UniProtKB/Swiss-Prot annotation:
It is a multi-pass membrane protein. Pfam families: CLN3 (PF02487). GO terms for molecular function: transmembrane transporter activity. Belongs to the battenin family. This is Protein BTN1.
Length: 395
């Protein structure tokens, strides 16, 4: 039985989203294992997101000059080598180098695949969004299954994920249907001397980048308020919760369904990703057009979680589990609805540029969250220790 091209498009972009984000999720889920309870988990967050943010920040100025097939090959190399380093290296520095390589791959992948959706109908974007949500569930869930349930070592568990990026090659070159290059007039002129992209090939020089700076900034300006600001706020809020507050949302061991405190953190990550997966997959059924609403609700969630850490309001971990799941629902809903609105509202000539550029705002929010969490997590932990609740210092 042969699948229809529309189904192949959805399956291909679902796989792209899954594989591109799964390593990012696993690294954050394993943060407590990589750096231990005494080091702020935001160290891993910054190494995991800052390179990705820099790629997204620079991409609008040059990324259209690199053919898609070369980008895919680069993604596989960076992510595979990165995860090998994370899983096999002993010094923390080398582990963080591996995290940085995987982060570069993740950022390049997000820009690449979001731009690639421009050549297909909305099934591509729906598949990508659902796949990125699935990455969270697969990454955190499989890591929790291997380490917490089955007792597999962290090293071996991380090594398993090093082989995931190979799927990019098979899906892009053999599963994804050919795309339509009948493009509308846009900022990137259509020429025929590059058969893979239809874009004129020329060297990427400093003069080329500088000459396009002002034009690019003008094109970014109308994207800020309706799309980039809400996405920035929701990501800042949820990643501050995940890396700066969640490690301190603990209860006495006898009240927990675990034997180690690190299992609480891993479970929080899995529940968050479950919420993200559900909401990112909900776009065909539920649409949110006022995307500032989930962003503001997420910020309120952050304030509540900080209050919970300082003076417990919720009496047990089960209610905190629900709170973290709700956090994931808000974040996933904001993400998928933002990019769907772009496909509906942006001019066709600007759509590919907008899809590839708005993603820098979520990374900016995560970077700021990491910087805040470097101070926030130790501050909350010290407050709890002085209050007689020193569980955040234990494994």
């Amino acid at each position: 039985m042969q699948l229809e091209p529309a189904h192949l498009v959805y399956a291909a972009f679902w796989t792209f989203g899954l594989v591109n984000n799964v390593l990012y999720v696993v690294i954050l889920t394993a943060a407590v294992d990589l750096v231990g309870p005494q080091t702020p988990k935001a160290v891993v967050l910054l190494a995991d997101v800052l390179p990705s943010f820099l790629i997204k920040l620079a991409a609008p100025f040059f990324i259209h000059k690199i053919p898609y097939n070369r980008r895919i090959t680069l993604l596989v190399g960076l992510s595979t080598v990165g995860m090998m380093s994370v899983s096999l290296a002993s010094p923390l520095f080398l582990k963080l180098v591996g995290v940085v390589l995987a982060s570069f791959s993740s950022g390049l992948g997000e820009v690449t695949f979001l731009q690639l959706t421009h050549f297909y109908d909305t099934r591509a974007l729906n598949g990508w969004s659902s796949g990125t949500g699935g990455a969270g569930l697969v990454g955190s869930g499989l890591f929790m299954l291997l380490t917490t349930v089955l007792g597999v070592s962290v090293k071996t568990s991380l090594l398993v994920f090093a082989f995931f990026p190979l799927a990019f090659l098979g899906v892009y070159f053999y599963l994804l249907p050919p795309r339509d290059y009948n493009r509308v007039p846009g900022a990137f002129p259509v020429h025929s001397n590059d058969p893979e992209t239809g874009i004129e090939t020329q060297p990427i020089t400093w003069e080329f980048v500088a000459s396009g700076y002002e034009t690019t900034m003008v094109r970014l300006k109308p994207l800020v308020m309706p799309y980039m600001l809400p996405l920035f706020l929701v990501y800042f809020s949820e990643y501050t919760i995940n890396q700066g507050v969640a490690p301190t949302l603990l209860f006495p061991m006898e009240e927990l369904p675990f034997s180690k405190f690190r299992d609480v953190y891993v479970t929080y990550g899995t529940l968050y990703q479950l919420g993200v997966f559900i909401s990112r997959s909900s776009a065909p059924f539920v649409r949110i057009r006022r995307i500032m609403i989930p962003s503001v609700l997420q910020f309120a969630n952050l304030v509540f979680c900080i209050a919970q850490s300082m003076s417990p309001i919720l009496p047990n971990v089960w209610l905190v589990f629900i709170l973290i799941f709700y956090e994931g629902l808000l974040g996933g809903a904001a993400y998928v609805n933002t990019f769907l609105l772009i496909t509906e509202q942006a001019d066709l000539a600007e759509r590919e540029f907008a899809l590839g550029s708005v993603g820098m705002s979520d990374s900016a929010g995560i970077v700021l969250a990491g910087l805040v969490s470097l101070w926030l997590e130790p501050g909350l932990c010290n407050y709890q220790v002085n209050d007689g609740r020193g569980w955040c210092t234990l494994e």
